[in-house]
Amino acid sequence: MASEIHMTGPMCLIENTNGRLMVNPEALKILSAITQPVVVVAIVGLYRTGKSYLMNKLAGKKKGFSLGSTVQSHTKGIWMWCVPHPKKPGHVLVLLDTEGLGDVEKGDNQNDSWIFALAILLSSTFVYNSMGTINQQAMDQLHYVTELTHRIRSKSSPDENENEDSADFVSFFPDFVWTLRDFSLDLEADGQPITADEYLTYSLKLKKGTSEKDKTFNLPRLCIRKFFPKKKCFVFDRPVHRKKLAQLEKLHDEELDPEFVQQVADFCSYIFSNSKTKTLSGGIKVNGPRLESLVLTYVNAISSGDLPCMENAVLALAQIENSAAVQKAVAHYEQQMGQKVQLPTETLQELLDLHRDSEREAIEVFIRSSFKDVDHLFQKELAAQLEKKRDDFCKQNQEASSDRCSALLQDIFSPLEEEVKMGIYSKPGGYRLFIQKLQDLKKKYYEEPRKGIQAEEILQTYLKSKESMTDAILQTDQTLTEKEKEIEVERVKAESAQASTKMLQEIQRKNEQMMEQKERSYQEHLKQLTEKMERDRAQLLKEQERTLALKLQEQERLLKEGFQTESRKMQNEIQDLQKKMRQRRTCTIS
């Protein structure tokens, strides 16, 4: 929980040791305790460009992420600092500072590419930090963005005729913020003042031409435009004279360039107000444990030589959470039944009604806590567990009723049995007295409350066990003629047969009630599942509509700039996306 976060400083989340990426268990432990949604801001850039200073400012501290004061890169791997979000109550701000790209000591671009890819996969806002202006050198240094399709997969197995276009990435890529440090130019174009955002848009314009040089110029710009439809730019003056840069974290704001101080404040304000909660496909809000799962899945994929895959990460997360959702739903069912049920219930229907209410709530708990339940395997598992729980309650109900009725019979009929043993009814007229007493005791038994569903069966079993005793009293009663005895025997047989028929009818009725309940359970599962699928479908369409709008904007820009070929490629992507949306709108839930 946010109130329980006490990270006084950053901690290494993903270690980079000798070119190998390893997850730090202590950092995962911190993430696992964060139950609120997280806003994840990652910063990436060349080493010694002041990334850590900005991250410390976002954390509200002067110190924390190592700034270093030499040309050596200080941050290795990816470091994490979790702080309560200053503008969004109930949210946690997770700051990720990455090791500097292009560190000559590493001599391994592979490593840089993975750090870059992980920062994109884990964040909801991706900050790219560089020095000076956006020139071709700055673009060349951002070559990692052109490699993303070779570093990240959105789907575990793309369709045969479907390349992973930017639509797949746009749906889960973070917003892009470019921070330009020690920016010394005047912000203007064609003699007119422009904003930092307009400067970024201007810098991302493409060159007409088909030469290799033109392609090299255009490729990173195209990738940024396609992968990151939402872009923002901030420029920063040099904070102090070069000689004082080494003491930057020790200096007070009044010792810094006022322009720089204001620019940093504007940057922090934007991040706090505009950075979104980390969200997965389908509108799934990421909290600490979910971020922990993503970190593990991605790093394990890279370590094993695979490409980190968004779909696989979500499915791995779904396996963990859906399994927990089943247990949570079952626990809720048990809690509700424990509170509501008093065994034995008077009728089976009473128990089944309580089961139905508790089951409905349990399904609601599962539906709220689950996602990406492929083939509804976990919901089927829940249905099976709830059915078993219901059967257990039915068995307990039966046993409780049997115990209660047996105890009642003992209390009510044991005095009669004692009288029989004493020979009180072994006399002329004794049989009629015995039958009268028996009827009185049966009436008393029937009047006892909460005997449960076994009341009749236990009574009839008891009476059947005493038939020989009843017959002995009948045969020894000398006041009855043989004919009367025969009639009485037939009457007892008829009464017993009638009771047996009644019991069979009751068993049949119980079976019918159980079958009706099973059908109602199935319909309840189906109803809630259908509603969830409709919500999921609406959410996905919403995401696709957002992606479509961004693609249409980009296509319009390409047309205005005169890039017909790129515009046609974008049109193909738009048509593919529109086709998927039509299919999703018309698909039926079976």
From Swiss-Prot:
Q: Which residues carry this modification: Cysteine methyl ester?
A: 587
- Sites of Phosphoserine modification: 156
Reply yes or no: does the keyword Mitochondrion apply. Answer: no
Q: How is it modified after translation?
A: Isoprenylation is required for proper subcellular location. Phosphorylated at Ser-156 by PIM1 in absence of infection, inhibits GBP1: phosphorylation promotes interaction with 14-3-3 protein sigma (SFN), leading to GBP1 retention in the cytosol. Dephosphorylated in response to infection, liberating GBP1.
Q: Lipidation, kind S-farnesyl cysteine: residue numbers?
A: 587
Name the predominant localization. membrane
Q: Where in the cell is it found?
A: Cytoplasmic vesicle membrane; Golgi apparatus membrane; Cell membrane; Cytoplasm, Cytosol
The GO terms describing molecular function are: GDP phosphatase activity; GTP binding; GTPase activity; lipopolysaccharide binding
The record ties this protein, via InterPro entries, to: G_GB1_RHD3_dom, GBP_C, Guanylate-bd/ATL_C, Guanylate-bd_C_sf, Guanylate-bd_N, P-loop_NTPase
For region GTPase domain (Globular), the annotated ranges are 1-309
Show where the GB1/RHD3-type G domain sits.
Answer: 35-276
Q: Which GO terms describe its biological process?
A: cytolysis in another organism; defense response to bacterium; defense response to protozoan; defense response to virus; innate immune response; non-canonical inflammasome complex assembly; positive regulation of pyroptotic inflammatory response
The UniProt keyword set, sorted, is: Antibiotic, Antimicrobial, Antiviral defense, Cell membrane, Cytoplasm, Cytoplasmic vesicle, Golgi apparatus, GTP-binding, Hydrolase, Immunity, Innate immunity, Lipoprotein, Membrane, Methylation, Nucleotide-binding, Phosphoprotein, Prenylation, Secreted
The record ties this protein, via SUPFAM superfamilies, to:
Interferon-induced guanylate-binding protein 1 (GBP1), C-terminal domain, P-loop containing nucleoside triphosphate hydrolases
Question: Propeptide per record: which residue ranges?
Answer: 588-590
Q: Where GTP is bound, by residue?
A: 45-52, 67-69, 97-101
* Mode of membrane association: Lipid-anchor
Q: Which reaction does it catalyse?
A: GTP + H2O = GDP + phosphate + H(+); GDP + H2O = GMP + phosphate + H(+)
Give the enzyme's EC designation.
Answer: 3.6.1.-, 3.6.5.-
Family to which the UniProt record says this protein belongs: Belongs to the TRAFAC class dynamin-like GTPase superfamily. GB1/RHD3 GTPase family. GB1 subfamily.
**What is known about its subunit structure?**
Homodimer; homodimerization occurs upon GTP-binding and is required for the second hydrolysis step from GDP to GMP. Undergoes conformational changes and oligomerization upon GTP-binding and hydrolysis. Heterodimer with other family members, including GBP2, GBP3, GBP4 and GBP5. Dimerization regulates subcellular location to membranous structures. Interacts with SQSTM1. Interacts (when phosphorylated) with 14-3-3 protein sigma (SFN); leading to GBP1 retention in the cytosol and inactivation.
Q: What job does the chain carry out?
A: Interferon (IFN)-inducible GTPase that plays important roles in innate immunity against a diverse range of bacterial, viral and protozoan pathogens. Hydrolyzes GTP to GMP in two consecutive cleavage reactions: GTP is first hydrolyzed to GDP and then to GMP in a processive manner. Following infection, recruited to the pathogen-containing vacuoles or vacuole-escaped bacteria and promotes both inflammasome assembly and autophagy. Acts as a positive regulator of inflammasome assembly by facilitating the detection of inflammasome ligands from pathogens.
- Sorted alphabetically, which PANTHER family does this protein's record hold? GUANYLATE BINDING PROTEIN
Protein name per UniProt: Guanylate-binding protein 1
